[in-house]
């Protein structure tokens, strides 16, 4: 189901109920841009902290324009999952000094057009949102009784014009009509809040309240002392305004409250965007970033990482093309997994997706991630308990517990990021040290071209005459070492901190000097004692 500002508040109770009743929730998002510059290129040298530091300053200029959530409920009697999917269309907003901005890239626009992204829905019907830090700012102005002035700062000309026109209508009604009440239709929640307070200030004798059954109408009484009616309390008006401005943050808070497992595919960037857009600006500290995410989403599963780890249990003939989301979903949906020939759960959508549905639509991709999670969990549970048992969500979650809070890291020094514990030590093959024997300055591009024939590598200088090479597989290391064993142009060996780094060599020389000096001192002392 598409969720925009037109139907969000009508559906919010249903969304809340589906979140509460679910056994897990899958997530996906579509972005306005991606990091493509050379400085953001994935590298096998990267630690997770270095990767985070590369991205944190640039993420603020990019936004999630679509968020997909699918709530999976389990029916034990039918041994089936019921999936309810939502696609939330989000659009930045201006309120006071909060001027949410974003950039688009031509390549991203082309990609989104290819996958039928609805830009009109994004711009005209997009749901507003704030982060928790934005909410704290609004509440501070509210406590200081400055919320009215703060919100007024960002009024556009058309909004000011509407407020003035409505005020004139009320003035005319008061002077020329005998009716006791008057209604104003105000769709804009910000204008509605401001108009309540503006009218009370201009015409102290009137009473304003929200119309029963229609929150977009302002009901005005000529006499504020009329029996049975009273002004809508300012606190209620402020609550309503902030509730509107928070927008999609209500859903984030529901996810935080109910602590349901969150499932996604390749979630590293998703977590960066989620933090920046709904928690607050990304912190300088990588550790604090992980802590903040874990406090909101304490249980995360990444099907990209899980499938990577479990693929080692498949034979070559039964493995998937790749563990990209589309390939993984089709592998399971087309029942190509021989590990899942018996007893798999039915997964049924409450509202089917459009027959022309394509990948890279957030709602559909979220569903696909959840579907793959169910199949991976079933496979893992079967290995633990056998194929004859009914396997519900608890058994699946227990079987996948070793992968909990481990988010895939693409082409980095380690294969995953751990949001609840320390990250793992580097688990890539040993680095190679390449020394140029003929030239005084190593040609890094030439070395990259030569060694690139062995497979995908990353390379960086290590002094004037040497470079470090990172590979993705041990067989590449072995093959390179064997091929260049007696090469006259380059000496290639396994990298050693003590042997090849300046600090390491300095430590060795310092140790040698200290050891030598101590030995001379002892010899001198011994010789002196003999003479005496």
Swiss-Prot record:
Q: How does it sit in the membrane?
A: Single-pass membrane protein
- This protein's record includes keyword Hydrolase: yes
One GO MF term on file is: RNA binding
Q: What parts of the sequence cross the membrane?
A: 503-523
- GO-annotated cellular components: endoplasmic reticulum; mitochondrial outer membrane; mitochondrion; nucleus
Gene3D superfamilies for this protein: Ribonuclease H-like superfamily/Ribonuclease H (3.30.420.10)
Q: What is its EC number?
A: 3.1.13.-
- This protein's record includes keyword Isomerase: no
Subcellular location(s): the record lists:
Mitochondrion outer membrane
Q: Which GO terms describe its biological process?
A: nuclear-transcribed mRNA poly(A) tail shortening; piRNA processing; priRNA 3'-end processing; siRNA 3'-end processing
Its biological function?
3'-5' exonuclease that specifically cleaves precursor piRNAs (pre-piRNAs) at their 3' ends. Trims pre-piRNAs to their mature size, a process required for piRNAs maturation and stabilization, and subsequent pre-piRNAs 2'-O-methylation. The piRNA metabolic process mediates the repression of transposable elements during meiosis by forming complexes composed of piRNAs and Piwi proteins and govern the methylation and subsequent repression of transposons.
Q: Which family does it belong to?
A: Belongs to the CAF1 family.
Q: What quaternary structure, including any partners, is listed in this protein's UniProt entry?
A: Interacts with Papi/Tdrkh; interaction takes place on the mitochondrial surface and recruits PNLDC1/trimmer to PIWI-bound pre-piRNAs.
Q: What is this protein called?
A: Pre-piRNA 3'-exonuclease trimmer
């Amino acid at each position: 189901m598409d969720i925009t500002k037109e139907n969000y508040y009508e559906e919010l109770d249903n969304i809340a109920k589906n979140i509460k009743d679910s056994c897990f929730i899958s997530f996906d998002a579509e972005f306005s841009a991606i990091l493509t510059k050379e400085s953001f290129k994935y590298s096998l040298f990267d630690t997770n902290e270095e990767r985070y530091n590369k991205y944190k300053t640039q993420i603020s200029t990019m936004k999630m324009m679509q968020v997909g959530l699918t709530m999976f409920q389990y029916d034990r009697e039918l041994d089936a999952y019921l999936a309810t999917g939502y696609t939330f269309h989000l659009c930045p907003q201006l309120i006071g000094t909060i001027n949410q901005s974003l950039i688009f890239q031509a390549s991203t626009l082309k990609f989104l057009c290819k996958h039928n992204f609805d830009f009109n829905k994004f711009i005209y019907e997009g749901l507003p949102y704030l982060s928790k830090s934005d909410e704290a700012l609004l509440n501070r102005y509210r406590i200081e009784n400055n919320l009215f002035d703060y919100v007024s700062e960002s009024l556009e000309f058309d909004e000011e014009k509407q407020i003035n026109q409505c005020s004139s209508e009320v003035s005319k009604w008061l002077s020329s009509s005998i009716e006791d009440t008057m209604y104003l239709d105000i769709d804009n929640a910000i204008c509605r809040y401001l108009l309540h307070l503006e009218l009370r200030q201009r015409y102290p004798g009137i009473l304003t309240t929200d119309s029963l059954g229609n929150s977009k109408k302002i009901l005005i009484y000529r006499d504020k002392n009329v029996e049975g009616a009273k002004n809508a309390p300012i606190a209620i008006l402020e609550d309503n305004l902030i509730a509107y401005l928070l927008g999609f943050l209500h859903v984030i808070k529901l996810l935080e409250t109910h602590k349901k497992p969150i499932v996604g595919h390749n979630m590293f960037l998703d977590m960066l965007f989620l933090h920046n857009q709904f928690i607050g600006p990304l912190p300088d500290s990588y550790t604090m970033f992980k802590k903040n995410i874990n406090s909101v989403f304490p249980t995360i599963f990444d099907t990209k990482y899980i499938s990577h780890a479990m693929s080692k249990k498949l034979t070559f003939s039964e493995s998937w093309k790749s563990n990209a989301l589309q390939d993984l979903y089709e592998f399971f949906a087309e029942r190509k997994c021989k590990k899942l020939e018996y007893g798999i759960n039915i997964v049924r959508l409450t509202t089917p997706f459009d027959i022309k549905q394509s990948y890279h639509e957030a709602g559909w991709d979220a569903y696909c991630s959840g579907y793959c999670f169910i199949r991976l969990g079933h496979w893992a549970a079967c290995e633990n308990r056998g194929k004859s048992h009914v396997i519900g969500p608890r058994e699946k979650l227990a079987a996948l517990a070793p992968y909990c809070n481990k988010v895939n890291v693409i082409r980095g020094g380690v294969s995953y990021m751990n949001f609840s514990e320390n990250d793992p030590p580097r688990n890539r093959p040993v680095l190679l040290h390449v020394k140029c024997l003929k030239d005084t300055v190593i040609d890094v591009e030439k070395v990259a071209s030569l060694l690139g024939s062995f497979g995908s590598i990353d390379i960086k200088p290590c002094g004037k005459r040497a470079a470090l090479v990172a590979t993705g597989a041990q067989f590449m290391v072995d093959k390179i070492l064997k091929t260049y064993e007696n090469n006259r142009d380059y000496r290639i060996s396994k990298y050693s901190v003590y042997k090849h780094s300046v600090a390491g060599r300095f430590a060795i020389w310092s140790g040698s000097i200290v050891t030598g000096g101590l030995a001379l001192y002892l010899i001198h002392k011994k010789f002196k004692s003999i003479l005496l």
